[in-house]
Design a protein with these regions (language model features):
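Conserved nucleotide- and phosphate/pyrophosphate-binding catalytic cores
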Residues: 2-188
Length: 188
């Protein structure tokens, strides 16, 4: 249950009940080139020969992020087990590479539970009719309807990983993931 990181704000917890596999994996994958080998020495039981080979590969081709991948996989496996590691890899593939169709209902539930930015949307609001444009404003993604419409028209708003092309699109119950979650995101 100890916090790990430079500051409490950016820290993760090495507790499988608190930090989901995706967040733990992502945190260690984002380790800097300067820190990663020290973390590997500190947190894993890599043998000296493999450590030297990984260090050499990292120095020669840091852009491949082999050491970060090794660290992220090992720490996630230690904290969450093999199933947790598989969840983290699937969630990373789904969210970071736009491969949303591979995500499972449990992935959406994990991501929602561990998200810092969530809002509650009453089911009756969907049933009564709300457009994506209005939803983006009501839940703080955009400051105004005109900003929302402009972003949608420019391909800058996604719902559940799909770019929204029609600012008048009505949200429906079928848009809910795990029967209760909608993920709105801003940016191309």
């Amino acid at each position: 249950g100890e916090k790990f990181g430079k500051s409490i704000d950016g820290a993760i917890t090495l507790d499988s009940e608190v930090t989901i596999p995706y967040k733990l994996f992502k945190y260690f994958f984002n380790s800097s080139d300067e820190e990663v080998m020290g973390y590997i020495k500190l947190f894993t039981d890599i043998n000296p020969k493999d450590f030297e080979e990984l260090n050499k590969a990292t120095l020669e081709s840091p852009y491949k992020r082999e050491a970060q991948m090794y660290l992220a996989k090992e720490i996630t496996k230690i904290v969450h087990g093999e199933n947790g590691l598989n969840d983290a890899i699937r969630q990373t593939e789904g969210l970071n590479r736009g491969n949303w169709e591979i995500l499972l209902d449990k992935d959406y539930e994990d991501l929602y539970r561990n998200s810092e930015k969530t809002s509650e949307l009453k089911r009756e609001k969907i049933e009564n009719g709300i457009t994506i444009q209005q939803l983006a404003v009501d839940y703080g993604l955009c400051n105004s309807l005109s900003e929302s419409k402009r972003l949608i028209n420019q391909g800058g708003i996604s719902m559940n990983g799909q770019k929204i092309e029609d600012s008048n699109k009505e949200i429906s119950i079928q848009d809910l993931k795990a029967d209760k979650i909608i993920i709105l995101s801003k940016g191309k």
